[in-house]
Amino acid sequence: MGKNVVVLGTQWGDEGKGKIVDLLTEQVTHVARFQGGHNAGHTLVIDGKKTVLHLIPSGILHSGVTCFIGNGVVLAPDALMKEIHELEAQEVPVRERLKLSPACPLILPYHVALDQARELKRGEAKIGTTGRGIGPAYEDKVSRRGLRLGDLLHEERFATKLKEVMEYHNFALTQYYGAEAVDYQAVLDEALLLAKELRPMIVDVSDELHLAREAGKNILFEGAQGSLLDIDHGTYPFVTSSNTTAGGTATGSGFGPLYLDYVLGITKAYTTRVGAGPFPTELDCEVGEHLGVKGHEFGATTGRKRRTGWFDAVAVKHAVRINSMSGMCLTKLDVLDGLKEVKICVGYKNSAGEDVGIPCDAEGWEDIQPVYESLPGWSESTVGAKSVDALPQAARDYIARLEALVGITVDIISTGPDRVETIILKSPFA
């Protein structure tokens, strides 16, 4: 029997999922994306060579692996083809191994225009989107006016639907946001041109995944962003527009939830966040600067500097619960090397000094103060360590304390950016 494993971020994204997905892909024949869009950035370092993927699953770099983009992913045809061409320029075969769900909502130029016009109008109150049209595309999906990849199989139908939806959005762009209208004919011509290249890759993704399961294949589901950015369970409204948690795996791929065997939570040894939104353990001091510089904390998609802070065990425990996580992968432990003291947030208090849990809205987060526990740091390097025994005792104590606080074991430890710099204590596919 094969195993079906989900890889998710437990924080606000940028936890290092790309490397771990790439590592685990050596044990699978199928990899699937199930939510998000090209707002996600997966950075892989293989034999010292850096590759950044935004839409295509990381498994594409492994020959013999079939990659799927499920119905929960919002698809920008131009961004996808750009990524395909870039991989093909590196002599990576893509088209015969990449399968696309016809139910993927399309991101088209008017979605991008709306996204950027909205952020501009919000001014200092902006949410901090990537400006790539993700939110507006999901809105169209929920309002049932959105165009889907399968519509491109029928040119006349696509043209009629496109005209109708563009009249609606251009009215908002010009009359409310004071922006320029998006040209209908230009959008139509480009979409139909791209459709010719995309059509051969369109398949029933749900059916293909179940056939693979029935054949006893190992399947990996690759999450994007992080659990604290989930549209329902994250720090609303400073969240993404999709379900980044384990429940999104089933709805975003058509794969039955009871067929999932293991949920791996990728967790940074400290905390980072890109853009606006609550961040109780944020450090605006030398330690925060140390984490940012040593951790190279710049977004793979936007290049924006990430905010940094101590490990938040309260938030991660919340992520463990809502995802029913089986085990954790701890990344970037080496960034803490050299610190005399490391802190962990073990609780929240409000301004009245009362113990509180995870708030459900941004206003509730504003009244949060972290409660810290301090542990000794370590001066020795953890970079490239191949076993737990090779880690400094203080680092091992830190890991053990994190396990106790969040309620699951650390099954994998990443000790550097290359996939060989990894300690596997328990394989999700074992």
From Swiss-Prot:
Any single Gene Ontology cellular-component annotation: cytoplasm
EC number: 6.3.4.4
Protein residues bound to substrate: 300-306
Domain of life, per lineage: Bacteria
SUPFAM superfamilies assigned to the protein according to its UniProt record, in alphabetical order: P-loop containing nucleoside triphosphate hydrolases
Active site: 14 (proton acceptor), 42 (proton donor)
UniProt entry keywords in alphabetical sequence: Cytoplasm, GTP-binding, Ligase, Magnesium, Metal-binding, Nucleotide-binding, Purine biosynthesis
Residues that coordinate or bind IMP: 14-17, 39-42, 130, 144, 225, 240, 304
Cofactor note as given: Binds 1 Mg(2+) ion per subunit.
Entry's Gene Ontology BP terms: 'de novo' AMP biosynthetic process; IMP metabolic process
Catalytic activity: IMP + L-aspartate + GTP = N(6)-(1,2-dicarboxyethyl)-AMP + GDP + phosphate + 2 H(+)
Amino-acid positions noted as binding Mg(2+) in the UniProt annotation, renumbered to this chain: 14, 41
Principal location listed in the UniProt entry: cytoplasm
A Pfam family hit: Adenylsucc_synt
Localization: Cytoplasm
Function in brief: Plays an important role in the de novo pathway of purine nucleotide biosynthesis. Catalyzes the first committed step in the biosynthesis of AMP from IMP.
Quaternary structure (record): Homodimer.
Annotated protein name in UniProt: Adenylosuccinate synthetase
Source organism: Teredinibacter turnerae (strain ATCC 39867 / T7901)
